């Protein structure tokens, strides 16, 4: 039954994909995955790169046919044929937790990844079944946030780690101006917050978030007592009703503000204009600290 649903899911993806019937243009740099590609493009020379979609959003018909005739109808085989054809000098990605990237082989080029977010023991990339270093998990260079996380990557992947910081944060200049916001709480809300009996990495959501709820209630009481204003920097993309309701259940109708996560939201400008940034485990918290801002971790 599981195989049936897996095949059905893949067929749905094939049905929704856009198809291209011409061979892609060969470039020196191949960007693996469209997510984060704009950030990588910003540090590359113009017209030096080609982007390889990896999420079935678009597929090259010629490579698919090649896979079909070789009896290897798998995304890994498709991606490998694509990479073999481009034969780039550099294969780079912003999606550092996709195992497919590490399994791809280059004829002559170098492989790079740029760490895109905070990694923890609960991250799928660091789950228990991946603790042993895979022989075929290899990159030439890992551009990581710091030396500590670099050492953790090297327990799993062969390659050299380089302290690089956050590309996204570093791409936005620090704005030193008058503070517009008082207490800015960086939300890490997920849909599971409203489904306490669901599990995350083997932990019930009710247990996963109980300490955060305890802290938020303390923050509510503290701000009421000291006449401080709280803003919530939203995490969820549309729809946001569940996230808004989660915080409303805690803060009620008190003096607080919810800032939606929209494509046009200037997130780094907002935290630069905040008096204190607070949070639990968001990458943005670490980025705020690296920007020289006042930060509280809990």
Task: Write out the residue ranges for each language-model feature.
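Conserved catalytic-core segment of nucleotide-activated headgroup transferases in glycan assembly
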Residues: 40-46, 167-249
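Hydrophobic/aromatic residues located in beta-strands of well-ordered beta-sheets
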Residues: 111, 142, 230-232, 295
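Nucleotide-activated donor-binding/catalytic signature segment of Leloir-type glycosyltransferases, i.e.
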Residues: 244-262
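A donor-sugar binding/catalytic signature common to diverse glycosyltransferases
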Residues: 93, 116, 153-154, 161, ...
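Active-site and donor-binding regions of nucleotide-sugar-utilizing enzymes
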Residues: 3-171, 284-285
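Short, surface-exposed amphipathic charged segments that create phosphate/polyanion-binding patches used
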Residues: 62-71, 127-129, 174-185, 268-279
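Conserved beta-strand elements of the Class I
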Residues: 30, 182-184, 294
């Amino acid at each position: 039954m599981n195989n049936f649903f897996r095949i059905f899911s893949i067929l749905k993806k094939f049905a929704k994909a856009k198809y291209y019937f011409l061979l892609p243009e060969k470039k020196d740099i191949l960007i693996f995955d469209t997510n984060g590609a704009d950030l990588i493009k910003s540090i590359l020379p113009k017209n030096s790169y080609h982007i390889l979609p990896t999420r079935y959003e678009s597929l090259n018909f010629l490579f698919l046919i090649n896979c079909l005739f070789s009896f290897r109808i798998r995304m890994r085989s498709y991606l490998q044929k694509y990479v073999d054809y481009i034969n780039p000098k550099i294969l780079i990605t912003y999606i550092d937790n996709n195992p497919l990237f590490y399994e791809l082989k280059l004829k002559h080029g170098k492989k790079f990844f740029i760490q895109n977010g905070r990694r923890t023991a609960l991250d799928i990339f660091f789950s228990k079944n991946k603790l042993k270093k895979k022989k075929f998990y290899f990159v030439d260079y890992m551009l990581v946030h710091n030396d500590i996380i670099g050492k953790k990557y090297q327990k799993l992947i062969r390659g050299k780690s380089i302290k690089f910081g956050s590309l996204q944060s570093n791409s936005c200049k620090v704005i030193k101006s008058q503070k517009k916001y008082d207490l800015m709480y960086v939300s890490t809300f997920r849909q599971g917050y409203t489904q306490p009996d669901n599990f995350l990495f083997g932990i019930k959501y009710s247990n996963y978030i109980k300490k955060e709820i305890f802290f938020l209630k303390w923050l509510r009481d503290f701000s009421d007592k000291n006449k401080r204003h709280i803003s919530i920097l939203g995490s969820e993309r549309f729809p946001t009703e569940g996230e808004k309701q989660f915080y409303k259940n805690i803060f009620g109708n008190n003096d607080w503000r919810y800032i939606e996560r929209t494509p046009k939201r200037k997130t780094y400008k907002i935290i630069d204009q905040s008096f204190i940034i607070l949070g639990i485990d968001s990458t943005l918290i670490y980025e705020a600290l690296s920007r020289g801002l006042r930060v509280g971790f809990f």
